[in-house]
Amino acid sequence: MTISVQNKNVGRITQIIGPVLDITFSAGKVPNIYNALVVTGKTPSGDEIRVTCEVQQLLGDNCVRAVSMNATDGLMRGLEVIDTGTALTVPVGEATLGRIFNVLGETVDNLGTVGNKQGLPIHRPAPAFVDLDTKLSIFETGIKVVDLLAPYRRGGKIGLFGGAGVGKTVLIMELINNIAKAHGGVSVFGGVGERTREGNDLYMEMKESKVINAENLSESKVALVYGQMNEPPGARMRVALTALTMAEYFRDVNKQDVLLFIDNIFRFVQAGSEVSALLGRMPSAVGYQPTLASEMGGLQERITSTKDGSITSIQAVYVPADDLTDPAPATTFAHLDATTVLSRGLAAKGIYPAVDPLDSTSTMLQPWIVSKEHYECAQNVKQTLQRYKELQDIIAILGLDELAEEDRLLVARARKIERFLSQPFFVAEVFTGAPGKYVSLTETIKGFNLILSGEVDSLPEQAFYMAGTADDVLAQAEALSK
């Protein structure tokens, strides 16, 4: 962020409490709330100081309280603070693709600065009601289990639940790949308060799977914005807004469909709670900030479809102590249109993507939104899988042969459905050696209807595993019979 030297408004630090700074300005020159301030000077050892902070409170007597976006080590009372006159401004546009940024929009991938000079402030109003696209439409992902049983809404918000090692990263990368190929869209990934190692692993895997093209960055499909666990709470609280601002540019100016990933939305709330306590606000339920609902709403309301394009957001949700009534996840749930739950049991069986077909939900799976055929097919698949789940205890004790003929047939079909819900991914080709498949919704419904109707009862279970469409199943069955 460049600062105009002429007419610069300069204040002085009067108090430092961890990441919170109190700064006094001249009378009549107090900066506005959310203005970015830059602390400049030198440490006693002669090192250059450049710390950016954001105004949070006006204390009176020409004094403001600001939260730092960088570590405050080495700062002293009396240091100069320059008011930039605007909110934090971050780079936007095609030049951001394939790059990694921090909360301030500075690149952290050692590939130099961003070429374009275009920037937008991170604090912006949500789109006006008249600009919103109110039509309910499905966002096709090309992933069978998602499109059939828990479809995503175009411009909606999806919660992604899953522990470590169940395939969250691979699912995210496949979605990024598919939106670029099928919708001509781009993605923005916001790493909010998660492990630095995970951020690095994701970047390396994206380069390996060509989601980021290291040779030609302009062909990359994603921009990455990281504010990881070791960052001050101010950075973790604002990094989601930095990522969202980059996504808004692609939606509003380039008129594209954008996928915005936030990993993890709980850390956004957690950082807000830390900042709230540092600012001296009275804590609310379970120690969270009293402004929890409005902070969450301020972020979520900007994620929407307009008449120009859409931002569809997929948010990993950490549930503290598995307590769904905790104010952080409970506030998040109010904004979600769908949930995608990853199951360790399915991952253990080798069924990937390990999306739980019974636990995952979507408000879009209604007969007046999706087609009647889609709705009936999804309900029949769920009923079959639910009945199979109920019969598993009986099978474990008595064996399959003790079941009634009708139940034996249902179990056989359920096992085929379970395997047909798996699918080879483009981004996993390097690991599996199997070519990835994008399966349209029409093909998905056709394939599951064939299983439910009994037309493919004679085919072996193995033919359905890692098959894309019904034609792939027939081809695999033929190969197995040889």
UniProtKB/Swiss-Prot annotation:
Matching CDD domains: ATP-synt_F1_beta_C (cd18110), ATP-synt_F1_beta_N (cd18115), F1-ATPase_beta_CD (cd01133)
Catalysed reaction equations from the record: ATP + H2O + 4 H(+)(in) = ADP + phosphate + 5 H(+)(out)
Entry binding sites for ATP: 162-169
Complex and partners: F-type ATPases have 2 components, CF(1) - the catalytic core - and CF(0) - the membrane proton channel. CF(1) has five subunits: alpha(3), beta(3), gamma(1), delta(1), epsilon(1). CF(0) has four main subunits: a(1), b(1), b'(1) and c(9-12).
Bilayer topology annotation: Peripheral membrane protein
UniProt-annotated location(s): Plastid, Chloroplast thylakoid membrane
Annotated Gene3D superfamilies: 2.40.10.170, Bovine Mitochondrial F1-atpase, Atp Synthase Beta Chain, Chain D, domain 3, P-loop containing nucleotide triphosphate hydrolases
Coiled coil: none
Matching InterPro entries: AAA+_ATPase, ATP-synt_VA_C, ATP_synth_F1_bsu, ATPase_a/bsu_AS, ATPase_alpha/beta_chains, ATPase_F1/V1/A1_a/bsu_N, ATPase_F1/V1/A1_a/bsu_N_sf, ATPase_F1/V1/A1_a/bsu_nucl-bd
Keyword Thylakoid: yes
Single Gene Ontology MF annotation: ATP binding
Keywords: ATP synthesis, ATP-binding, CF(1), Chloroplast, Hydrogen ion transport, Ion transport, Membrane, Nucleotide-binding, Plastid, Thylakoid, Translocase, Transport
Biological process, per Gene Ontology: proton motive force-driven mitochondrial ATP synthesis
Primary localization class, coarse: plastid
Cystine pairings recorded for this chain: none
Annotated function: Produces ATP from ADP in the presence of a proton gradient across the membrane. The catalytic sites are hosted primarily by the beta subunits.
One Gene Ontology CC term in the entry: chloroplast thylakoid membrane
Protein name as catalogued: ATP synthase subunit beta, chloroplastic
